[in-house]
């Protein structure tokens, strides 16, 4: 939909509800929740009427982008882990290592001005923690789907540019390593979202009914994820 010089893209979710709702999220996504059976023309009319309000909120959220500044990997800089900020403490050591001690990322390198080395060490630490924490999160989320007699997917972890997670047709659940920066509840949300695709490949009404059933507070978790990592 075009409003002035801007094109507004929106996603429609059909759900068992009586009224239509429009929401603008911090990441710039516009979501329309409509009662099952609502005609597309009716949705378009509502969006056109609310176009000014939608653009106002999109502009509001844009002022905060990018939320995370470019990282320099120097002492005193803050980095996220499981939703909390920790400062870097860099010191000289015989071998490179990263430890999380008393609210600090304590990084040892052979040269204090080696920001590239600090970055590599921290990313390797994140990858190691992601492997462990994501497996724990998966085990928390899986029982709800095991009851549905669905095939257990294989878990894969790697860095992804544009997605937090995905589920392949071959049954591989891939999670973005960077998700380790988010709170545990948000990691659980991403995993649960992808697991719902085992039964519902698209984002139709059945998908959201299942998501609502296994995780009633999924919208709050999604919102918190957007606030933390957008």
Language model features with spans:
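Active-site-proximal or metal-binding-adjacent scaffold patches in catalytic folds
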Residues: 1-189, 198-230
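Walker B catalytic acidic pair
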Residues: 194
């Amino acid at each position: 939909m075009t409003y002035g010089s801007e094109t507004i893209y929106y996603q429609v979710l059909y759900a068992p509800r009586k009224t239509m709702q429009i929401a603008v999220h911090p990441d710039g996504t516009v979501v329309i929740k409509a009662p099952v059976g609502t005609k597309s023309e009716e949705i378009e009319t509502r969006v056109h009427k609310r176009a000014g309000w939608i653009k106002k909120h999109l502009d509001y959220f844009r002022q905060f982008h990018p939320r995370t500044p470019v990282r320099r990997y120097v002492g005193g800089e803050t980095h996220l882990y499981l939703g909390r900020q920790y400062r870097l403490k860099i010191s000289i050591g015989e071998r490179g290592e990263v430890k999380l001690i008393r609210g600090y990322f304590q990084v040892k390198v052979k040269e204090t001005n080696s920001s590239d080395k600090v970055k590599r060490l921290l990313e390797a630490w994140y990858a190691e923690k992601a492997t462990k924490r994501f497996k724990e999160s998966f085990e928390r989320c899986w029982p709800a789907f095991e009851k549905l007699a669905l095939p257990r997917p294989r878990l894969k972890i790697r860095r992804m540019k544009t997605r937090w997670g995905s589920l392949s047709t071959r049954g591989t659940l891939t999670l973005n390593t960077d998700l380790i920066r988010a709170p545990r509840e948000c990691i659980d949300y991403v995993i649960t979202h992808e697991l719902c695709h085992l039964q519902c490949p698209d984002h139709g009404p059945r998908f959201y009914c299942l998501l609502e059933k296994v995780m009633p507070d999924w919208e709050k978790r999604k919102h918190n994820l957007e606030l933390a990592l957008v």
